[in-house]
């Protein structure tokens, strides 16, 4: 394994991809744990380890499709497992943020995004953003598809649209790949259960929603997403309330209901649903469903049936029912 000292400016390294591989191995050896701890790592080394500025090399290592032009060159240095892929994806995003002029300050469990200098958008490195934006407009849909079953990687990749120079959208929108990104992110929200990934997706939708060049398209996607999520919640609420099967299988229906509420809660808390361009048909039905669930704690628990399940399953049911409430009524 290479030492990070070998990656300092002026030192000879076998190849750019070997250098990226060395950084990944170093990070895994140190065992940072939470990927958020990569923020100070990148912040402190970005000016001294030049490979951290090579976003293209990191992106090429993520694309394992053999049809990728760079595949032959990168094959020997590709991530060996999901842990290396996750580190690479989060490292890439941290480096894009640093290069763009965005600083993340990790304080306890809270992340605050700050802009360098005068903390104004104009202080961002727009030249750097304009450099990587067209590339990711093209490859992000492919990467989303490639890592569709890996939430750890997706939670990093889905942040990239927020970092792109959306002022160039008039040029980028002709790229079918970029135009599909809001739809893909919306589909993730409708199917994923991982909280970190859901929050990252909703933050991206909110960022795209607030930009004049992408807002109209994203608001249409959000409207469709909300209709889909409310319908999903209706179906899963009915499945729970009208459950008539093996009591041991009831927890599965509860978990599905909890997942639907988690998705809705993520959207409601982070996306602007008050926009005039957001109009979903099932808005009234959502209100009725929430009121219905608010008074359904005991009904969801099915106390009269709890003696039919084992101790662990009973505890799991109580836990999930509490989660169902918390997802919509966090103040309680």
Where are these regions (language model features)?
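Extended alpha-solenoid helical-repeat scaffolds
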Residues: 1-332
């Amino acid at each position: 394994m290479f030492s990070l000292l070998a990656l300092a400016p002026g030192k000879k390294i076998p190849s750019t991809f070997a250098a990226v591989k060395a950084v990944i191995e170093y990070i895994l050896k140190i065992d940072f744990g939470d990927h958020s701890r990569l923020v100070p790592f990148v912040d402190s080394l970005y000016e001294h380890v030049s490979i951290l500025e090579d976003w293209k090399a990191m992106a090429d290592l993520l694309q394992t499709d053999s049809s990728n032009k760079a595949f032959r060159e990168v094959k020997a240095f590709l991530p060996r497992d999901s842990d290396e892929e996750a580190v690479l994806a989060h490292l890439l995003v941290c480096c894009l943020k640093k290069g763009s002029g965005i600083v993340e300050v990790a304080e306890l469990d809270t992340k605050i995004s700050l802009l360098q200098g005068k903390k104004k958008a104009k202080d961002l490195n727009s030249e750097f953003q304009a450099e990587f934006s067209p590339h990711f407009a093209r490859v992000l849909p492919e990467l989303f598809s490639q890592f569709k079953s890996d939430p750890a990687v997706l939670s990093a990749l889905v942040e990239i649209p927020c970092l792109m120079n959306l002022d160039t959208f008039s040029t980028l929108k002709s790229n079918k790949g970029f135009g599909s990104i809001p739809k893909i992110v919306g589909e993730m929200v409708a199917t994923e259960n991982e909280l970190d990934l859901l929050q990252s997706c909703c933050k991206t939708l909110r960022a795209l929603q607030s930009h004049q060049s992408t807002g109209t398209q994203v608001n249409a996607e959000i409207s469709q997403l909300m209709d889909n999520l409310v319908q999903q919640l209706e179906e899963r609420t009915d499945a729970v309330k009208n459950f008539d099967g093996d009591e041991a299988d009831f927890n599965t229906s509860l978990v599905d209901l909890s997942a639907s509420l988690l998705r809705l809660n993520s959207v409601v808390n982070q996306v602007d649903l008050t926009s005039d361009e957001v109009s979903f048909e099932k808005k009234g039905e959502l209100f009725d469903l929430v009121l219905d669930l608010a008074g359904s704690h005991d009904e969801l628990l099915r106390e009269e049936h709890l003696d039919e399940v084992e101790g662990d399953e009973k505890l799991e049911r109580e836990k999930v029912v509490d989660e169902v409430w918390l997802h919509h009524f966090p103040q309680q």
